[in-house]
């Protein structure tokens, strides 16, 4: 029961050596060759890779053709390349987009592969997803939410394959995730942005005379509360937390120190990966007064996260970086529904707007508070409110005991998360957490 055939279809691209084919009129009759190898794999041991090219949570159209040049590096590595269509953040003329339909469509594609595994090339237990930005986010969601019951009604709605011919449940879990700059964990994305970046900005919507500068400070403070309740741990099992500081907003504590060390390690790696001569390393960092180079360990320290952000990672989005005050960000469309293309979704910002008094600022509009509160109560066509759909699109919901989804999904065992450390689209804490 596909909502749209333009998207809910897929293409499977297979190395030729995995097939024995004979021409039959205008088509070919093909059978799997299970003895031939490509890069050490056979047609039944080859990993399956699925690109999630959905930047900004956009749609991914199903393929209608292909170019070998674009696929050669995958096929020559022995991989099975599966390009599945999926709906994106925007509603279509005759279908609903937004959360959770994009990930639901990808899950349906994974289930299709497993249902037909006997007749298809590839190892059904070695499915890997990869993507950038919103595609990195949806890759992370797929990796964290395997077999989550929250998706059951949505999968049934589009007629996805739920059981095999023997009546066994079909899994939509994946083996691994490669996520570049994942724009995710949207329930706290706004507060993370203001804590990591916004609190150091003094222009635009963060200029001192604006009501949004006060909102920025309140959002940054809310992030500290979240982190202290989240109770993340470092590699040694130590709980990470934030503490009040004499300057800045909660820029002290073990969580802050951990973030600072991540930045320092990144620069240390950069120097050692790109220079062999110690004098060249010293020369590179000498232009930054906030960086100290240790020539014996070939490592760096920085004075503060604030100095790094001011120099390298400026806030490039307004306050309400993801849930825009005027519902103009891509993420507002992600949590729209069939009645409204774009809706507010940030419950923390809503609580702040409805509890704090910004009336002393001449540019404040009190209608924001009621608009946020109203939007959060909207439901989608399956009668789920925004918070449920946000949980479905939040990898952390499945990964930490802070959330109710912990240990209620099949989480991918293999992860690689990368980011441009200076990019201003999301807080560095998104990938770090």
Please tell me what each predicted stretch does.
Residues 10-15, 23-57, 72, 128, ...:
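Short beta-strand element of the alpha/beta-hydrolase
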Residues 42, 63-81, 156-160, 164:
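Short amphipathic alpha-helix adjacent to the substrate-entry channel of hydrolases
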Residues 48, 75-87, 128:
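A fold-wide structural signal in alpha/beta-hydrolase
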Residues 177-184, 188-335:
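Non-catalytic, alpha-helical, charged scaffold/linker segments
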Residues 275-433:
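C-terminal subdomain of alpha/beta-hydrolase-fold enzymes, centered on the catalytic histidine
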Residues 115-200:
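Primarily recognizes the serine-hydrolase "nucleophile elbow" in alpha/beta-hydrolase
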Residues 44, 49, 54-61, 81, ...:
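Serine-hydrolase catalytic-loop signature spanning alpha/beta hydrolases and amidase-signature enzymes
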Residues 96-119:
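Alpha/beta-hydrolase active-site loop
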